[in-house]
Amino acid sequence: MRIIKNEEINENLFSQMVHLDHEVWPSDDENYLPTSYLHRLYENSKDGLFFAVDDEDKLIGYQTLIFVDEDNFQKYYETGDFTVLKNIGMKKGNNILYIYTANIKEEYQGSGCMKEIGRAFATWLIEQEEKGYHVSVAYAEAVTPAGVKTVTSGYEMEPMEDVDETGLGHYILKDGMKAYCEKMLEDINL
């Protein structure tokens, strides 16, 4: 398994990601993201794409992130409409990160694939920080019980006002992903 990220991702891998996303979220599901929307989301910037592939370059899992401005996030937060989100890419200075989607093929769940993606993501964030690209705040929305576990245990995010009794809803991380990066890389640096 290896991780491919950002601009290294070609159209074939992107199509595999869309296919896997649609296996989990079919068109009749309220969380379905249309193919045209996913392409539009990354047409100007592939910052935030982290794909795990096998030895034959077949996608086995992914994490997608986007960078938004405050007005765009607020519009999404108020409407609940995923399609209003616009990926502006990571810019020098402060950035708002939206942790978008993650998925691992069923046969690879529990294999450590998501942890490897997380390490690649954390390493990339640290590299960007050194170049003057900062994450000032991160947001995510948990739409499944597994998503709740990811945002609370994996990212250690705090619930926002709309989180319901099951944990579904929006979460925030105000430290700019610093603790997450440390956690993901601590066992590598031992």
Regions found by a protein language model. Give the residues of each.
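Conserved acetyl-CoA-binding loop-helix of GNAT-fold acetyltransferases
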Residues: 104, 110-126
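Terminal substrate-recognition subdomain of acyl/acetyltransferases
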Residues: 5-9, 24, 28-29, 102-106, ...
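Conserved acyl-donor/pantetheine-binding loop and adjacent beta-alpha core of acyl/acetyltransferases
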Residues: 64-101
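Short beta-strand micro-motifs in enzyme catalytic cores
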Residues: 48-50, 95, 167-171
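Polar/charged side chains located within well-ordered beta-strands of beta-rich proteins
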Residues: 21, 63, 118-121, 141, ...
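Short amphipathic alpha-helix that is part of the acyltransferase structural core
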Residues: 1-61, 67
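Conserved long hydrophobic alpha-helices within structured protein cores
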Residues: 58-73, 113-120
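Short, solvent-exposed loop/turn segments that connect beta-strands within catalytic domains
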Residues: 55-58, 72, 131-134
